[in-house]
Amino acid sequence: MPKRKYGMILVSLSVALVLAMIAGTSLGALGFQPGLVLQALSAPSDPANALVISVRLPRTLVAAMVGASLAVAGAAMQAVFRNPLAEPGITGVSSGAAVVAVLMIVSGLAAANPLMLPIGAFIGALLAVSIVQIVGGRGSSHTILLVGIALNAFLGAIIAAVIANAVNAEDARSAMFWLNGDLTGRTLSDIALVAVPIVVGMIGVMVYARELNLLVVGEAIAHTSGIRVERTRQIVLFAAALTTAAGVAITGIISFVGLVVPHVVRLVWGSDHRLVLPASALLGGTGLLLADLAARIIWQPVALQTGTVTALVGAPFLLVLVIRAVRDQQSPQGRCRGCRVAQKHACAPVVGVRIDHAAVPHSHVRGRHMAICPVVDGIRCRSSRVLGASDAFQGTPCSGFGDLLDALHRTGHHRCQHPSW
């Protein structure tokens, strides 16, 4: 995709985010009042403008920041684990924050100082991620994934036990309220507390956009391309965990933003993480702002929790993803309709090469799918034209998937040799 088009997409999403922020600060019990926002910004010390400055503006800024952080973290997790169902809390970040938050709420420590709850939740999230990295960091991405799932289950049991045995019913209710995720009561102090880790974590992920493009193809291909796979994976996971921990610390657990938004971006604009990550940040902020806006106005005068709205929207989307994946697996010969690469790939129609959704970003690929036969371990190429090498390299494992796709478009064919075919 041309850089000019990248810029147009990001500018459009930025405009949408600004409009959503204006709507978030302008809509209230008295309807849409954009003039009130301008008045409040021009005279912030006026007591008449306290509602906008102290309540609506912090809530809007928190929604934009947390939505962006969750979406970027989700996109990074899906790339590292090569799993479309990966989300920011998969490494135990959310559960670690939740355990500490619930303990502080039930014990009464959270009531002593408003800042103790987000600080404690942030520390708990980082401790959980550290455990996952220490236990599973030396293994593959699948090992980290399994350790994260086990830790989530263990911490979830602790949370359930603490809430079930809470002496004060009101404390138990407050803990459940926090677990569902909400933006009510957020202040400028909360923003100042988490702004730095959120921004640092997001930048840390975006710096590795090119490496994520290669990790999506496979760790073997990334390694042959000169990427230090283990180091890159650990840095990206820590950066994603950092920005997630900061967001969860002040809002509670808001589900599905980190799962849904990256998928929407990939479906619409492709899988190049140089675009996916910033676009996910902008669309994630916009999406959470709209979800919070819906939570405030759908059931007036009662306000729903923001996490409830995101779950109501995200759960059906997850079902659509599952149905679509099952349909693709059941398609004849694994052939992907509409995939231009598969149509030019001689292996696909002949031997039924499986077509996967883990698309590799490439300027000439218009579909959302790709043939994975060139990147499966053990498959060897006959064609030196595909590898762009001399005859001496025929029969060596495929590497450099971008060069391979270029050759596919130039030659119109590609032949593979595999012992099982």
Mark where each language-model region is:
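Cysteine-centered motifs
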Residues: C336-C339, C347, C373, C381, ...
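Short, low-complexity, intrinsically disordered N-terminal modules
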Residues: G338-C339, A389, G412
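Active-site catalytic motif of lipid deacylating hydrolases and related acyltransferases
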Residues: P374-L408
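Intrinsic-disorder-associated, low-complexity terminal segments enriched in Asp/Asn/His/Tyr and depleted
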Residues: H345, D356-H357, H362, H369, ...
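Alpha-helical transmembrane segments in inner-membrane proteins
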Residues: M1-R335, S363, M370, P419
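Conserved acid/base catalytic micro-environments in cytosolic active-site loops
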Residues: R340-V341, G402
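Short, surface-exposed "cap/lid" segments of acyl-processing enzymes
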Residues: A342, G352, V360-L387
